[in-house]
């Protein structure tokens, strides 16, 4: 950062009228001081040189401090924008990476779907059979609404079936078909134009071969992810507080895959990949480009993309401010460099006042009356310089404080959004897996053999291997007896807190039941959520014959969500003073990145904070455990259908905390 500012100092300064104005004022005062000192030297021969020499030394200290101030003003004005921009880029990249990881698991699971395999194994299919599978895929996309098409390809490129009936093509020449067949039983990720979606300039498609029971290739399954819709949602949320900027997803070859401003950065235009902060001129305008690449999630890193944020250089200082008092500046500890400059300028001004006072005493003793106006003028200049220092620092501190509060609020909202997005997937998984034909056929039988239990356990283990966010996945029957699990356990009765009983009362495949966040035997007596969906009889669609339970691996998953969104230092560690947690409406902690607050304990914030946060994310000062914090609270609002229209209610909050040193009342 410092090297970047030093390299582009004059360009940056030209876009910051406030900084330039302070520099001009200080230079004018310095010039006037020089002229007044010269007059003093000419007209004060009787005083000797000691006082004037002391004044010159003090003037030199002011000059050095002036350069330090201007450099810090440039640094901080630039830093407040770039740190926020960098954070937004990383947030967008992290959210997208998490989302795409789920897609890699989806394609692996769906490629083994019994109904899809049976359909593709037939040489010829009737309209009735096509309609049945089409409904099956419609149910899938009703759960996983992030897809805008599902396509089944024969090995020769024939389109056997597709969800989006608006496309009339019957054959595809897309190279992803052969690439997928070459890859074997792993997924292929394709991001470019595809004749499978001819109306799009760029598609993101996950594909994987489909095999029969003898491991003969039947064709290729393609899931078309609606990346434009997803990125529009992500970017729009991050640009609410930064509407003059634009964001783009850039591929490894420097092409724009998606942009928040299609006019200035159209899809497939060249933006170039950048490795670090960059000053770039585009269409007669200077931009600061911040960038973030994937940090990976569950060993998945994505296709080598990066997110860029372009902020016009002339908007760096267009930030509203909040009042910041001397106490806030000095005591919070949030602005150490600025506080040090302000303190030093005060000390230098005090020294100058003493020198002037000594000069007045010496002038009186030696009857050098002509020197008094010079001393008064220099005293006034010193006071004016200090006022410039003081006002410029206070203005900047107010700007930085505003940015700090905005950052905390944004991070809290992001944490809440990431949680909703993650748990949205969990609600989808349980409902879709409950429609698995082999699960339903097995539980529809009056008795299940040991061999069948073992086969079910193997299927569950395969799924669990794809979806590693679960501790275990299990099936239970209508008597609440454990039938099979991904860990090999069987037998026994489902515990009361698992939501299994509530699941057996469900009446629709689109419904699901979730346990409270309480300790569970299925999770080593640690608190977690268990997601359940009912299995319906294959022939009697209204009869519930059991359920599937998904034990969310909440401890590492929630912790990773919080850790990912917290600001990082240059070494990649969480910045000092920052912590975060998820809580329920009563303040009970679900997860925390702070040893002080463990799951099940209570974050002792006033209840009014949570009530006010329901209306809008907020930031407050508060004392916790004898320490002072800035606390941002954001409510979870749901994602797509999850907690918005699916009937599930569980109000949670994300809390971001920044510890500081002020000791005044809350």
List where the protein language model places each region.
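Solvent-exposed, extracytoplasmic
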Residues: 131-144, 220-267, 273, 313-333, ...
């Amino acid at each position: 950062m410092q090297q970047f500012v030093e390299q582009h100092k004059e360009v940056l300064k030209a876009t910051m009228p406030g900084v330039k104005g302070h520099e001009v004022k200080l230079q004018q005062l310095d010039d006037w001081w020089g002229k007044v000192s010269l007059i003093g030297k000419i007209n004060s021969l009787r005083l000797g040189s000691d006082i004037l020499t002391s004044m010159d030394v003090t003037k030199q200290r002011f000059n050095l401090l002036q350069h330090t101030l201007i450099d810090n003003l440039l640094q901080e004005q630039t830093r407040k924008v770039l740190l926020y921009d960098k954070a937004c880029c990383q947030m967008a990249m992290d959210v997208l990476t998490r989302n795409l990881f789920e897609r890699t698991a989806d394609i692996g699971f769906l490629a083994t779907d019994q109904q899809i395999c049976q359909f593709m194994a037939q040489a010829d299919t009737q309209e009735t059979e096509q309609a049945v599978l089409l409904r099956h895929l419609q149910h899938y996309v009703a759960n996983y609404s992030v897809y805008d098409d599902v396509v089944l390809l024969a090995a020769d490129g024939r389109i056997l079936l597709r969800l989006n009936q608006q496309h009339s093509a019957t054959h595809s020449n897309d190279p992803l078909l052969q690439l997928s067949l070459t890859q074997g039983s792993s997924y292929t990720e394709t991001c470019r134009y595809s004749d499978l979606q001819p109306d799009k300039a760029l598609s993101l498609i996950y594909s994987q071969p489909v095999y029969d029971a003898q491991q003969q290739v039947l064709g290729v399954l393609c899931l078309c992810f609606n990346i434009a819709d997803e990125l529009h949602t992500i970017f729009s949320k991050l640009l609410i507080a930064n509407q003059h900027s634009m964001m783009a997803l850039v591929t490894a070859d420097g092409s724009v895959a998606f942009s928040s401003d299609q006019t200035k950065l159209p899809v497939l235009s060249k933006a170039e990949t950048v490795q670090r902060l960059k000053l770039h001129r585009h269409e007669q305008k200077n931009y600061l480009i911040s960038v973030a690449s994937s940090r990976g999630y569950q060993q998945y890193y994505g296709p080598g993309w990066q997110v860029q944020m372009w902020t016009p250089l002339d908007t760096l200082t267009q930030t509203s401010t909040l009042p910041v008092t001397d106490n806030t500046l000095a005591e919070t500890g949030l602005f150490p460099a600025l506080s040090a400059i302000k303190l030093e300028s005060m000390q230098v001004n005090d020294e100058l006042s003493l020198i002037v006072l000594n000069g007045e005493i010496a002038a009186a003793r030696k009857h050098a009356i002509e020197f008094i106006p010079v001393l008064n003028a220099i005293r006034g200049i010193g006071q004016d310089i200090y006022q410039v220092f003081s006002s410029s620092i206070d203005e900047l501190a107010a700007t930085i404080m505003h940015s700090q509060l905005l950052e905390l609020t944004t991070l809290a909202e992001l944490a809440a959004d990431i949680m909703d997005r993650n748990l949205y997937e969990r609600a989808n998984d349980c409902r879709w897996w409950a429609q698995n034909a082999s699960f339903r056929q097995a539980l529809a039988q009056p008795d299940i053999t040991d061999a069948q239990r073992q086969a079910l356990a193997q299927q569950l283990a395969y799924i669990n291997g794809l979806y590693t966010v679960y501790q275990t996945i299990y099936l239970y029957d209508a008597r609440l007896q454990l039938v099979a699990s991904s860990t090999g356990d069987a037998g026994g009765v489902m515990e009361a807190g698992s939501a299994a009983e509530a699941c057996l009362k469900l009446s629709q495949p689109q419904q699901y039941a979730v346990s409270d966040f309480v300790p569970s035997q299925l999770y080593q007596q640690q608190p977690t959520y268990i997601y359940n969906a009912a299995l319906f009889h294959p022939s009697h669609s209204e009869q519930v014959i059991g359920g599937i339970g998904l034990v969310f691996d909440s401890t590492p998953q929630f912790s990773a969500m919080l850790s990912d969104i917290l600001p990082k230092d240059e070494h990649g560690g969480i910045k000092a003073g920052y912590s975060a947690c998820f809580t329920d409406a009563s303040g009970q902690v679900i997860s925390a990145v702070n040893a002080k607050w463990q799951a099940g304990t209570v974050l002792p914030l006033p209840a009014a904070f949570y009530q006010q946060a329901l209306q809008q994310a907020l930031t407050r000062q508060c004392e916790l455990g004898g320490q002072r914090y800035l606390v941002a609270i954001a409510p979870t609002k749901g994602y797509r259908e999850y907690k918005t229209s699916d009937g599930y209610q569980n109000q949670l909050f994300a809390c971001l905390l920044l510890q500081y040193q002020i000791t005044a009342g809350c």
